[in-house]
């Protein structure tokens, strides 16, 4: 789970959607000694432009350095520190759970429905579940499933954007 501690920042960046950009951004953090807690990258609303969501720790001075350095990269179009209270954050989790009996399957399906997840695959001894939400919701869901035996787990980490009509 990515906990939003006081010195944790959500940085959103619009970048050219082409090979090598992620490597250059990650390299910048490495060279400066900044730790990336999480990074997600995907298409934006504009063709050829990707949105990066970077979760990083540091005080305001560190955040200012990160922002300035990101803005210097040629492939970076825009950078913004997102205010946690004014931000919508979500992540995706897929989890394969041991479920050989009908009663276990039934209980897992009930938990999945309560957490508004979906069963995306079924096999004779396992269910694969997809759930989205904030990190705390996903952590709570996984805690319930641990008793059944988690066979595989994949989490995207948070992606974020500003609430309301404000855009990058």
From Swiss-Prot:
Its EC number is 2.2.1.6. One of its GO terms (molecular function) is acetolactate synthase activity. One of its GO terms (biological process) is isoleucine biosynthetic process. Pathway: Amino-acid biosynthesis; L-isoleucine biosynthesis; L-isoleucine from 2-oxobutanoate: step 1/4; Amino-acid biosynthesis; L-valine biosynthesis; L-valine from pyruvate: step 1/4. Gene3D superfamilies: 3.30.70.260, ACT-like. Chain A, domain 2. It catalyses: 2 pyruvate + H(+) = (2S)-2-acetolactate + CO2. Keywords: Amino-acid biosynthesis, Branched-chain amino acid biosynthesis, Transferase. SUPFAM superfamilies: ACT-like (SSF55021). GO terms for cellular component: cytosol. It is an enzyme of class 2 (transferase). Transmembrane segments: none annotated. Residues 10-84 form the ACT domain. InterPro entries: Acetalactate_synth_ssu, Acetolactate_synth/TF_NikR_C, Acetolactate_synth_ssu_C, ACT-like_dom_sf, ACT_dom, AHAS_ACT, AHAS_small-like_ACT. Belongs to the acetolactate synthase small subunit family. Dimer of large and small chains. This is Probable acetolactate synthase small subunit. The gene is ilvH.
């Amino acid at each position: 789970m990515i906990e939003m501690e006081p010195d944790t920042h959500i940085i959103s960046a619009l970048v050219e959607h082409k090979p090598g950009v992620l490597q250059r951004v990650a390299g910048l953090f490495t060279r400066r000694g900044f730790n990336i807690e999480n990074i997600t990258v995907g298409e934006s609303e504009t063709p050829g432009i990707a949105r990066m969501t970077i979760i990083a720790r540091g005080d305001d001075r560190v955040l200012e350095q990160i922002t300035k350095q990101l803005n210097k990269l040629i492939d970076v179009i825009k950078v913004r520190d997102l205010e946690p209270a004014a931000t919508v954050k979500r992540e995706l989790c897929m989890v394969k759970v041991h479920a050989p009996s009908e009663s276990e399957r039934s209980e897992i399906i009930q938990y999945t429905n309560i957490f508004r997840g979906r069963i995306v695959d079924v096999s004779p001894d396992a269910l694969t579940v997809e759930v989205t939400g904030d990190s705390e919701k996903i952590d709570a869901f996984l805690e319930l499933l641990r008793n059944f035996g988690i066979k595989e787990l994949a989490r995207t980490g948070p992606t974020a954007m500003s609430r309301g009509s404000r855009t990058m």
